[in-house]
């Protein structure tokens, strides 16, 4: 009897619209691969009902909180339904940029200089010591919520007078915020499928940084795959990807984002354990470069579900 697969999409996070697009593409690809797949929007369908509705596996096409942060993974573990992507712990950690950075630092892996702030510090007013630490990062800099994806809530700060507004914007989305030093780029991303490392992609955007519009809406963002790195640089990036992936305990599939600094070194940005699968998405692009069609890609990801 064929497996019945739930493609979990939509949800209630700030990335709902992107998830709906990803889920629709995944559903189409799975059906093309001959898989009995069904779209399930967990905003309207309680995940606890998946077992009683006869689903054997779950393809997680959710992004952001509630779908990518270990919450749903825990429910699926309880139901004993195999699912795509990383487990509970790795999903929770990778959703949290701050704790990902702490872990990478502890493993001796390169991350951009940063200052962590919480809401209590913000409400009390940033003291002289914190401001000195932020000033030491230089300008421009980036302000990011710790636990959001798709560049939601991120601002680039070019002048000191812009910092307060950027912090207020980031704190709309989370109680913890990162203030990061600017890295000149370019930005690279590397897909991981099981034990396979996909070719790197170089991202070139017309905007100040790779924000939500550049990721999902703009036709001016350029993607280069092959990325133009030398063989030695590609090997270095591959090894960094593997080290970052393993340090956070990731499994299944995902994407590691890095930035190159002015010193020519790679610095880790974040790991996505449920990357976008839209027409602008990067893992399908890299998989295609490696000779894998979209339907082959989603079928392979589903095979890795456990």
UniProtKB/Swiss-Prot annotation:
Class in the EC hierarchy, top level: ligase
Keyword Cytoplasm: yes
Function: Cell wall formation.
Residues noted as binding Mg(2+) 2 in the record, renumbered to the chain: 270, 272
GO cellular component: a single term: cytosol
Binding residues for ATP: 134-189
Localisation per UniProt entry: Cytoplasm
Record-given protein name: D-alanine--D-alanine ligase
Organism: Erwinia tasmaniensis (strain DSM 17950 / CFBP 7177 / CIP 109463 / NCPPB 4357 / Et1/99)
Known pathway: Cell wall biogenesis; peptidoglycan biosynthesis
SUPFAM superfamilies in UniProt: Glutathione synthetase ATP-binding domain-like, PreATP-grasp domain
Keywords: ATP-binding, Cell shape, Cell wall biogenesis/degradation, Cytoplasm, Ligase, Magnesium, Manganese, Metal-binding, Nucleotide-binding, Peptidoglycan synthesis
Domain of life (superkingdom): Bacteria
Family: Belongs to the D-alanine--D-alanine ligase family.
Pfam families found in the cross-reference section: Dala_Dala_lig_C, Dala_Dala_lig_N
GO molecular function annotations of the record: ATP binding; D-alanine-D-alanine ligase activity; metal ion binding
Swiss-Prot/TrEMBL catalytic activity: 2 D-alanine + ATP = D-alanyl-D-alanine + ADP + phosphate + H(+)
Residue intervals of the ATP-grasp domain: 101-303
Gene Ontology BP annotations: cell wall organization; peptidoglycan biosynthetic process; regulation of cell shape
Annotated positions binding Mg(2+) 1: 257, 270
């Amino acid at each position: 009897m064929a497996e019945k697969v739930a493609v979990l999409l939509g949800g209630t996070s700030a990335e709902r619209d992107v998830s709906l697009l990803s889920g629709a593409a995944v559903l189409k690809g799975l059906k093309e691969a001959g898989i009995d797949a069904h779209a399930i929007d967990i905003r309207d369908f309680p995940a606890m009902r998946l077992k009683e509705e006869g689903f054997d596996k779950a393809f997680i096409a959710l992004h952001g909180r509630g779908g990518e942060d270990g919450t749903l993974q825990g429910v699926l573990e309880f139901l004993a339904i195999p699912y795509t992507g990383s487990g509970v712990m790795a999903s929770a950690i990778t959703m949290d940029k701050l704790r990902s950075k702490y872990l990478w630092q502890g493993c001796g892996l390169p991350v951009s200089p940063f200052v962590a702030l919480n809401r209590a510090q913000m409400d009390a007013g940033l003291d002289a010591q914190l401001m000195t630490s932020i000033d030491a990062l230089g300008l421009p800099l980036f302000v990011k919520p710790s636990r959001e994806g798709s560049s939601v809530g991120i601002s680039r700060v070019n002048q000191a007078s812009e910092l307060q507004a950027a912090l207020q914007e980031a704190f709309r989305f989370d109680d913890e915020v990162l203030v990061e030093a600017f890295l000149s780029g370019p930005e690279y991303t590397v897909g991981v499928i099981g034990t396979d490392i996909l070719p790197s992609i170089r991202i070139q955007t017309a905007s100040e940084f790779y924000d939500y519009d550049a990721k999902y809406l703009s036709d001016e963002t350029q993607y280069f795959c092959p990325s133009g790195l030398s063989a030695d640089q590609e090997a270095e990036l591959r090894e960094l990807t593997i080290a970052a992936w393993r340090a956070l305990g990731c499994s299944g599939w995902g994407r590691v984002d890095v930035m190159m600094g002015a010193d020519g070194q790679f610095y880790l940005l974040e790991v996505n354990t449920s990357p976008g699968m839209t027409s602008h998405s990067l893992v399908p692009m890299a998989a295609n470069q490696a000779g894998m069609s979209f339907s082959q890609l989603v079928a392979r990801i589903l095979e890795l579900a456990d």
